């Protein structure tokens, strides 16, 4: 996998991932790369992480991920992720993140956007680490985040979706905490955000660490306006 990423370099290309369980991981440092399952749902990145971070560590111009499964990813700092996004645009579709410390963890890139569609996040999150909780999705200070037609379920700690992005859209998705353990909020916007949260389905589970809210807005202070949210 890394050889294929290196071959594309600063250009544009598509990597087709064959069915099966893969112990490969890759770091993308440039270019625009699509990672596509040859058969959606049958290509699994299992128990593998590059740089002690995640199966795909992305810091190029853009990346697209389609039809892939990320499973059993754990690292010593408790932030093991299917995708670790450090900068650039990201589009994820028809993918499954499960049984890991985090699904997607993104850093800071206020000029870029993240789009997630038709994807599932199962048994993710942990509060084991000394640095605080990991979450199913945790997005840093990004330009925008869009999550549509996706499912979050059976969390294992932290929040289902935490985002510090300036703009947010969470539409037509489900958050089922019925089988969750030690979970917190469904959606946490710690610094505020503007946009739209609509047509979602929320089920509060019995084994939560925090039952106080489904959605929180600016609990850590107002970094961005939430006017019109």
Language model: regions and residue ranges:
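Right-handed parallel beta-helix/beta-solenoid
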Residues: 1-7, 19-21, 38
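Extracellular beta-strand/beta-solenoid scaffold signature
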Residues: 2, 47-57, 76-84, 99-108, ...
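Flexible, charged surface loops at secondary-structure boundaries
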Residues: 6-11, 28-29, 58-59, 85-86, ...
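Detector for repetitive beta-architecture
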Residues: 12-14, 19, 32, 42, ...
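Right-handed parallel beta-helix/beta-spiral solenoid domain characteristic of secreted/periplasmic
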Residues: 14-19, 26, 30-78, 125
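Feature marks extracellular polysaccharide-active and adherence modules
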Residues: 18, 36-38, 46, 59, ...
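Extended, compositionally simple hydrophobic/Ser/Thr-rich segments
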Residues: 105, 113-114, 127-128, 145, ...
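Glycoside hydrolase catalytic-domain groove-lining segments
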Residues: 196, 202-210, 225-229
């Amino acid at each position: 996998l890394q050889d294929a990423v290196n071959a594309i370099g600063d250009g544009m290309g598509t990597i087709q991932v064959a069915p099966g369980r893969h112990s490969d991981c890759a770091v993308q440092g440039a270019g625009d790369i699509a990672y596509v399952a040859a058969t959606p749902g049958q290509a699994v990145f299992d128990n593998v992480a590059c740089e002690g971070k995640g199966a795909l560590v992305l810091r190029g111009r853009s990346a697209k991920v389609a039809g892939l499964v990320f499973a059993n990813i754990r690292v010593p700092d408790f932030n093991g992720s299917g995708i670790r996004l450090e900068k650039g645009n990201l589009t994820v579709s028809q993918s499954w993140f499960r049984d890991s410390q985090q699904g997607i963890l993104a850093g800071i890139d206020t000029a870029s956007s993240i789009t997630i569609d038709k994807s599932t996040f199962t048994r993710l999150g942990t509060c084991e680490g000394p640095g605080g909780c990991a979450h199913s999705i945790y997005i840093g200070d990004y330009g925008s985040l869009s999550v549509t037609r996706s499912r979050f379920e059976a969390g294992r700690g932290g929040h289902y979706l935490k985002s510090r992005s300036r703009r947010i859209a969470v539409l037509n998705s489900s958050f089922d905490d019925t089988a969750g353990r030690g979970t917190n909020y469904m959606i946490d916007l710690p610094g505020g955000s503007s946009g739209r949260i609509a047509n979602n389905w929320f089920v509060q589970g019995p084994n939560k660490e925090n039952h106080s809210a489904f959605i929180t807005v600016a609990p850590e202070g107002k970094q961005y306006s939430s006017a019109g949210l």
